[in-house]
């Protein structure tokens, strides 16, 4: 689904990438879960849905999946097909690049993702040639090994990252969050790591609230707060984007 072709000045654009077995439509409510502030008052949201594919760690069951996962608990070595990840990244880039071509400032583009979607989100940001507004990873992991570092451009390294993880999560252990932040900081990136001791593998309102405040903070630092405009959010339900031609 192509973004709207309005010629009005483009507002901030947020891509939300869902977790394994979920859909974009089921996450639409998140656009209204962020408080109406300068950061998200007029944000345009996209909720793509992953293609349906067999997932090895779920005994080959067909479900929406950005790429195959071989093992659970999930770690970076649970992903064994790099090309599978890169195909997903290219589709995220296509969505972002269409928005930029339509007039959205790259620094007004944010990529958020939960679990497998968080893994795809951080991979997409690291491989994008431009500095984007930011990336928030909720209980995610790195879907690659350390050799991936040579592919990250100098511009991508300037994109700020928030990584939120639960100490009580067992599907994607807290070690994956710590290892991810260590990798990003090794690249010289600006990262924040927020751990909630009692949080399992789920998404809670207080995480969204923390993310919103993080976005406001980085916008303030960059002088891009803008005016608070109480207008309706535009939501793009990009269903099965990755299966479209």
Swiss-Prot record:
UniProt family annotation: Belongs to the AB hydrolase superfamily. AB hydrolase 2 family.
Gene Ontology molecular functions: carboxylic ester hydrolase activity; palmitoyl-(protein) hydrolase activity
Name of the protein described by the UniProt record: Probable inactive carboxylesterase Os04g0669700
Pfam families, per database record: Abhydrolase_2
Origin superkingdom: Eukaryota
TM stretches of this protein: none
GO CC annotation, single: cytoplasm
Catalytic residues, chain numbering: 115, 201
Gene Ontology terms describing biological process: regulation of plant-type hypersensitive response
Organism, scientific name: Oryza sativa subsp. japonica
